[in-house]
Amino acid sequence: MDRKAFNDAVNALRPAGRRVARGTTVTSGWMGNRLQDLSMWLVNLLRELPPRVGRLVLALWRGARGLVLALPQAWRAATDRSGPGLAAWLRRVPREVGIWLIVLLFRVLDLFGVPELWSFFLQMVCHVTPLTGEEIGTAAEILGPTAIRYADVRIAEGGALNFVFARNGGRAFTTFHTINLPRTGPHCRANFAILLHELVHVYQYERTGGLYVAEAIYAQNTTGYSYGGPENLQQCLATGVCYRNFNREQQAQLVQDYYERCVEEHPVAAFEPFIWDMQAGKF
């Protein structure tokens, strides 16, 4: 092969070489990010261990206490003629036991770091990015600068989530520290009010553990998102209702509505006492 032919061959291979180099860089960067995410599993497991152990012990204590008190309560229900009776008490027992088992399950899952492992798995099958500086700054103005570990929050889009959003109507949802958003539609990342709503769920997770997932799903299927608007907030304040008395979805919706009213320069006085409770972490 003469020199000219050799140079032509090299020049022809250069674009392919650049593509391989770019692909290697992207792959190594992706692997580096995933290894960093995996290392955070152990960090968060150790950091969250004391409160998670405390929540598990509390759940076990409540279960033991309920078991000890079951017989006296059954006797009282059977002998108190002014009450609903033993049959009503027996009908109530399966529901209370079921709730306790769900609480216990989530406390055990928390203890072993399952929320972090779930988030790591999700990040393997979706496009994941951290919050931007602008998103953190705006969220901090509403939630508070130290409300949550903003650096740990990830936004997941695309990938396997496309299958989920095709079936749930494109509704955003939050799994622990990962906020799952569709790329298009009213719940996409560009809608900061929705992102803020989901950040409240992250806040709930950090304060109360993974149980917030079950509580939010229950809220969606029972009392829903509506807290009654500003008029009801004034009445709630007068009767001693606090932020923690709202369900998990109402808590997030209240913060979302407060932000939107601030942006639109509408009155927010009725919201402020509840926002102060939220900023203080009173979930």
Language-model features: locations:
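Conserved beta-strand->loop/alpha-helix structural units within folded catalytic cores of enzymes
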Residues: 192-205, 258, 263
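Metalloprotease/metallohydrolase-associated module, dominated by Zn2+-dependent proteases
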Residues: 41, 52-55, 62-65, 70, ...
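Hydrophobic or amphipathic, alpha-helical segments that drive membrane association/targeting
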Residues: 2-164, 185
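Short pre-active-site segment immediately N-terminal to the catalytic Zn-binding motif
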Residues: 164-196, 240-244
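Short, solvent-exposed loop/turn segments at secondary-structure junctions
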Residues: 156-162, 179, 185-187, 200, ...
